[in-house]
């Protein structure tokens, strides 16, 4: 417990909240260019080949972003829109690529949860 003299000398500092997606710089989304598209394996107990992309953002950051959905058309130099949101079983992946915008096409033949994958309504 500090004394009154100590509190006068230096006041209590408010707790600053640390952002979970610093590369977005406070924006809801950011545009970026893919520098590498590859797969990584999740941590235990899961097993898969998760599709990710290394993206250079307009904010100057180089980040790893997850590519959601089944199948994608992304390659090097593809321009993508990136949003926040981590992937729990992929350490270091704190961003998602938005499907159905810019160069990332929507998921084909998607019936449910279409808005999350940029899929058009089936005829």
Curated annotation (Swiss-Prot):
Recorded coiled-coil stretches: none
Keywords: Chloroplast, Plastid, Ribonucleoprotein, Ribosomal protein, RNA-binding, rRNA-binding
One Gene Ontology biological process: translation
The organism's place on the tree of life at top rank: Eukaryota
GO terms for cellular component: chloroplast; ribosome; small ribosomal subunit
Localization (cell): Plastid, Chloroplast
InterPro entries referenced in this protein's UniProt entry, alphabetically: NA-bd_OB-fold, Ribosomal_uS12, Ribosomal_uS12_bac
CDD domains: Ribosomal_S12
MF-aspect GO terms: rRNA binding; structural constituent of ribosome
Membrane-spanning ranges: none
Assembly and interaction partners: Part of the 30S ribosomal subunit.
Classification via PANTHER family: 30S RIBOSOMAL PROTEIN S12 FAMILY MEMBER
Similarity comment text for this entry: Belongs to the universal ribosomal protein uS12 family.
Function: With S4 and S5 plays an important role in translational accuracy. Located at the interface of the 30S and 50S subunits.
Note: Exons 2 and 3 are cis-spliced, while a trans-splicing reaction is required to link exons 1 and 2.
Protein name: Small ribosomal subunit protein uS12cz/uS12cy
Gene: rps12-A
């Amino acid at each position: 417990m500090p004394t009154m003299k100590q509190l006068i000398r230096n006041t209590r500092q408010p707790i600053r909240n640390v952002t979970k997606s610093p590369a977005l710089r406070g924006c809801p989304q950011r545009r970026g260019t893919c520098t590498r598209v590859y797969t990584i394996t999740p941590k235990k107990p899961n097993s898969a080949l998760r599709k990710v992309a290394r993206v250079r953002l307009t904010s100057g950051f180089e980040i790893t972003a997850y590519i959601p959905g089944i199948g994608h058309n992304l390659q090097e130099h593809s321009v993508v829109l990136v949003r926040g949101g981590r992937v729990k079983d992929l350490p270091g992946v704190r961003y998602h690529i938005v499907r159905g915008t810019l160069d990332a096409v929507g998921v084909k033949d998607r019936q449910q949860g279409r808005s999350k994958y940029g899929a058009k309504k089936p005829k």
